[in-house]
């Protein structure tokens, strides 16, 4: 992908994770930059104007989320304090999940999906508060902006998409990936050399 980048808003905070829910609200976390009004670490912050202005929601000075997911009903995040956290009130309060380490989290088909070291891809059975491996590998996860698909990047850089959580279609390979964002038919993946776009039909 080629083009020109441009700053949004005046913030110089170091955002480590960003998620968007179906209403367009952005949720983020990371480290406070110079002149920032936020705590360090930032906890969960929110923007309702596409990232121009942000407000603190919770966990300021406590949590540094490195992966976040939001679907309009729940927010899930993995924090570097070693906590998987779950909220059903837009981040005002949190419940702990069953793992202490996760590469990435995603919300898809009303389920929390996790990419976990030494486990691979798994879902969270909330009733039993336990993870259930699904037999696939993954280090990065992303749900399409309209919730219609989920993408995963494997440890070998292979990229797959699912529309139902069971059947996966390979879209390509990118090598070592650092971040991913997706729509139903496209994934944008950040690597050490730039941003790559993969597309798949259907």
Predicted features by range, described:
Residues 1-202:
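Extracellular glycan-interacting surfaces
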